């Protein structure tokens, strides 16, 4: 199961990913709250992703642009760079 969020969101609550893949194609797609990722978070975008990422899931960087993860990240599932640059 895959859900793609492409617009900018302004909610401040957290995001919980418990199964499948959540694809964010905009650095503002997940609002400003913490992300608890226990499945797969795919960031198909460039820019500065400032949300904190925790949980046991994997983070995937896709898309051609450069992406910075500047939040306080504690996720343990590893990072896969399928395309683009992670800085």
Predicted features and spans:
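Surface-exposed loop/turn positions within long extracellular repeat scaffolds
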Residues: 1-56, 66-87
